[in-house]
Structures are given as C-alpha cells and as structure tokens.
Amino acid sequence: MKNLLSMEALTVHEIEHLLEQAAQFKHGKKATFKEQTFAVNMFFEPSTRTHTSFEVAEKKLGVEVISFDASSSSMTKGETLYDTLLTMQAVGVNVAVIRHSDENYYAGLENLDIAIVNGGDGCGEHPSQSLLDLFTIKEQFGTFQGLKIAIVGDIRHSRVANSNMKVLKRLGAELFFSGPREWFDDSYLAYGTYLSIDEMVEKVDVMMLLRVQHERHSGTERFTKASYHEKFGLTEERAMKLKEDAIIMHPSPVNRDVEIADSLVESEKSRIVTQMTNGVFIRMAILEVILKEKSRRAKVCTY
C-alpha cells in the first residue's frame, strides 16, 4: 500500500490486515522504524481528533513530526500543493497526512515519492475514520456479515458516510439511511434502504449518527436544533427501543441534543469515545503499513 487515498482503493485483504495490525497495537505491540522517519501533518481544515490522533500515532511509532502551518507556508504566496509536497519530499519527509477542503485534491499527486494519507477531502472520503469505524464494529461483533447498520443525518455532506456506505456493503452489512431528504441522494440507494429513524431504530445493530455540517450548507436551514433532534435525532425515547446489544457511533465532533441526546453520548451503548481511542491504533497501523512498504520499495530500487 503506497498511499491511503480512498476506501475503494483498498482490497478486502488490505482492510483485514489493517484491522488486525490495529488490534495488535491496541494489545501492546510495539513498533519503531530502524531508519530515521519523518511525517508532516498538513491540515487545511479545522480538526481535533484526526490531527491529534495521527500525531499521537506517529510519536508512538517513533516517527519524527515536522510542524506545518498552512497560513504561514509558501502556499499563501501561490505555491501549489504539488510543489509544497515536492519540497517535503526533497528535504526527506517520508509521509504526509493531508486534510483539504477540495474533493479529490490528491489527483496528480500519487506519483510523488512521498507517501500520502488522506485525512479527509471535502465531502469526498475519510478513509482513516472509516477504518477506525470498522475496527470499532469488528471489536464489538467480530464480523460485518449480516449486521444491520444505520447511517443517520447529514449524509450528502459527510465524507465519513461516503466512505462507510461503500465499504460496509462490500463487507456484507445491510445498510439503512435516514435524515432530511434534502441531505440525501437517491444514488445512495445502491448501498442501502432509506427509512425514517423510527422505522429502523428497533432493527439495527449499529446506529451511526452524523454531524449536521452547517459549514457546508448554503442558504437558510429550515431546522432548529430542537426540531432536528425531535425529527431525526437519537432521543432518549428512541434509544430505549434499540436492541439490547446495539451500539451507538458518531465520528465527532458531536452536536449534543441535535444528532444525539446529551445523556447518550457517554452511555453504556455508546462507542463514541472508543472510536476516538481506536483512531490512534488504526492510524498506527496505516502508517506502519505504508512506511514499511515505502522502505521495501526503496531497498529494491537500490539493487
């Protein structure tokens, strides 16, 4: 695996290998690189969980993290992302984790020698979040085959939903969608069934809630926080109807009492904090696999 750009680019075998490596890290596996290794985290959109968990993952692996601030870089002078990465490559940086507001920003960057990990591209994909979601689900249920999984909320604007719906169907899960119709596209019906949240709540194994992404909406929104919560959110009353072994997930940040009742965020069924914890281990696995492959290819080229 040279880069991690999208979930669609991963084979099922590669996904399973990453999940297994993450499990090993969670259970105490240690890993460092023999050669000095450098990473740069280039975030052009705000981030808490993805940014910090990648940095923790890098440091746990013994990777040296190079500071980068987009607002003080030469990109403010018109330098392209390609040329910025070419610079990073030239000075010896091995891997770049990038979050960008543009979908498919990585087109044309794949042939650079520096490895690229997509930390989220606009409304496109968020592969490391998708992998940590898979890791969390597999920890709970041991399989994806036959699981009923609900994806609820601002689906159209969610890169997490875009990544998850495709891979979960590939892995054998049955998907259900819910949320405002104007934030849903009929093309998603290729992956699952649209229902109201009340129609699905009693049947699903995983209730995956999505943040209302106000920053990606144009025009006036027709929902207040209270009205959205009442119509589309996981209220305390709805949560009481969940199956006994069902779990609640959310990629965060959470809008409490909008997508999910405040009292449910840290409830017994919630795996929201677990997802954050698992993010470090899956990102360690991603970096280890990519950097070891990069090292292997470099050695082959020297012979």
UniProtKB/Swiss-Prot annotation:
Pfam families: OTCace, OTCace_N
Keywords: Pyrimidine biosynthesis, Transferase
Annotated GO biological process: 'de novo' pyrimidine nucleobase biosynthetic process; 'de novo' UMP biosynthetic process; amino acid metabolic process
Residues that hold L-aspartate according to the record: K77, R159, R211
Broadest EC class assigned to this enzyme: transferase
Amino-acid positions noted as binding carbamoyl phosphate in the UniProt annotation, renumbered to this chain: R49, T50, R99, H126, Q129, S252, P253
GO molecular function, one term: aspartate carbamoyltransferase activity
GO cellular component terms given for this protein: cytosol
The protein's role, per its UniProt record: Catalyzes the condensation of carbamoyl phosphate and aspartate to form carbamoyl aspartate and inorganic phosphate, the committed step in the de novo pyrimidine nucleotide biosynthesis pathway.
Family, similarity comment: Belongs to the aspartate/ornithine carbamoyltransferase superfamily. ATCase family.
Summary of subunit composition and partner proteins: Heterododecamer (2C3:3R2) of six catalytic PyrB chains organized as two trimers (C3), and six regulatory PyrI chains organized as three dimers (R2).
Protein name: Aspartate carbamoyltransferase catalytic subunit
Source species: Listeria welshimeri serovar 6b (strain ATCC 35897 / DSM 20650 / CCUG 15529 / CIP 8149 / NCTC 11857 / SLCC 5334 / V8)
